[in-house]
Amino acid sequence: MKRSFIFAPGMLALSISAISNAHAYNNLYVFGDSLSDGGNNGRYTVDGINGTESKLYNDFIAQQLGIELVNSKKGGTNYAAGGATAVADLNNKHNTQDQVMGYLASHSNRADHNGMYVHWIGGNDVDAALRNPADAQKIITESAMAASSQVHALLNAGAGLVIVPTVPDVGMTPKIMEFVLSKGGATSKDLAKIHAVVNGYPTIDKDTRLQVIHGVFKQIGSDVSGGDAKKAEETTKQLIDGYNELSSNASKLVDNYNQLEDMALSQENGNIVRVDVNALLHEVIANPLRYGFLNTIGYACAQGVNAGSCRSKDTGFDASKPFLFADDFHPTPEAHHIVSQYTVSVLNAPYRVMLLTNANNVPVKGALASLDGRLQQLRNVDNEQGKLGVFGGYSGNHSHTLTLGSDYQIMDNILLGGMISRYQDNSSPADNFHYDGRGYVFTAYGLWRYYDKGWISGDLHYLDMKYEDITRGIVLNDWLRKENASTSGHQWGGRITAGWDIPLTSAVTTSPIIQYAWDKSYVKGYRESGNNSTAMHFGEQRYDSQVGTLGWRLDTNFGYFNPYAEVRFNHQFGDKRYQIRSAINSTQTSFVSESQKQDTHWREYTIGMNAVITKDWGAFASISRNDGDVQNHTYSFSLGVNASF
């Protein structure tokens, strides 16, 4: 506004310090006004003249993507221009209608499916509406509709994802106060003096900020009154009323524009990442110290100097404290940085939340590890018909699964059983992401021996899972904000495994293994509490897994202590990726994120031992290592004891 104011995380191998590369976004395209202009008409922030010292929000986003953002005049993909509006009627030289249509025309009306787009416009349209009260609503409506139409044009042309920030509140900028003062007769010299006074005050919250503004108006009223107290009071009231009216009108127009655009954006499907910069601005002004700012009503550049030509070494530049504003309308580099952090946090949030899909599988694997130890033990003993067995097991790595089970030998060669497993985990699988997992796995299983050497085992299992205290951290300059939620999930599936024991010696056998496992996982969608700009909601997650396994094992029967070893080669036939739909809480739009392609081939090595303590008491233990499966911990172990009656 020239005239106006990031993939698989943790177990999914996503680097959350940058924008996820689960979808290979390899370029960034930007359309907008001076908030986004990388040099077409200027760079509107402190020390932004040559673009080497200060970065805009979109430069930071490009950096997270691993690319350099270059303005379109130099052949790059940043088409934004200072002073641009959404419609040509308000600025026929610089507008996003021409920016978007020109871009599409030069690319055969095809957008980049692997490209990330930013469309941020509206501040100058609001400014035009303020200057034309009679046509204000018409201007706001037409501009908001035009902006949303341009976004849909990009999506319809194949754009992979479009970031659409809300217009920040013009009514909260220093320009409003200076406009009221100028209208009241203040000269440039007067404004420079007032600017110095305003800059001297720390504005620690919104009330303090308003007190500073009222204090300035009161002092002016006193200065022009000539000692007449009544005149001073009247002048002060006129200035305060004028400021309140103009600021309120500007804020209402901004809210109206943002609401209209959001409604229009939501009318069609599309991958739209809405980021509420307007709400973020209000949050910063309400508590600036939290975000590293000391003044939100003054600005760093000298009075009358546009941010596009402002240098920190210039005479009149105020480096005494961190300011929110560079000039009377444009943000400082620090403010741009916080916008980029916020935007990247929204983009990366789904990849953190998708960790829960894989987390669903952890208690199931833990329970089945204990079951496998029990079944291995049963295959190596002569279990008489009518024998009742009970066992308890523990498995884990970074989590804990306790199992209690019982089985019954209904025939000489057929055994049936059931077990219940309790899972507990306090997990932080990625930076600034934590959850407490609690769940129960219910399993029914059976073992059939045939022709003395052949065996088939099968199981059916169901997981009931609760995720409490899901905490997502968002770093905003010096402040770590946390969003909280809870949800639930379940998983059900089954396995069938077969082998044939081949004697090598009287105490050693070997066996090929074939297994098919199927699981269906579900995590309920949830909404983070609160109405912060960063609070989001996430859709349900579903994932089908079908794994075929070939392997070989070696078993011993030495008596009291019987070691065994096994190697398995696994192939995933089910879903290779999973998706989630997400959005900030304050929008009607949403976007879909897709995980990285999951490993389709991996190996699993297991060594273990079962022990015969007495005739009716035994124990078992094993340790397994996954190789090539980043979705699961590299090592896990299981141990248990059993008794028979």
From Swiss-Prot:
Database matches in Gene3D superfamilies: Autotransporter beta-domain, SGNH hydrolase
Organism superkingdom: Bacteria
UniProt signal peptide: 1-24
The EC number(s) this enzyme carries: 3.1.1.3
Cited InterPro entries: Autotransporte_beta, Autotransporte_beta_dom_sf, GDSL, Lipase_autotranspt_EstA, Lipase_GDSL_AS, OM_autotransptr_brl_dom, SGNH_hydro_sf
Molecular function GO labels: triacylglycerol lipase activity
Gene it is expressed from: lip-1
Transmembrane spans: none
Biological processes, Gene Ontology terms: lipid catabolic process
Active site per UniProt: S34, D327, H330
Keyword DNA damage: no
Catalytic activity: a triacylglycerol + H2O = a diacylglycerol + a fatty acid + H(+)
Subcellular location: Secreted
Protein name per its UniProtKB record: Lipase 1
One Pfam assignment: Lipase_GDSL
Keywords, comma-separated and alphabetical: Hydrolase, Lipid degradation, Lipid metabolism, Secreted, Signal
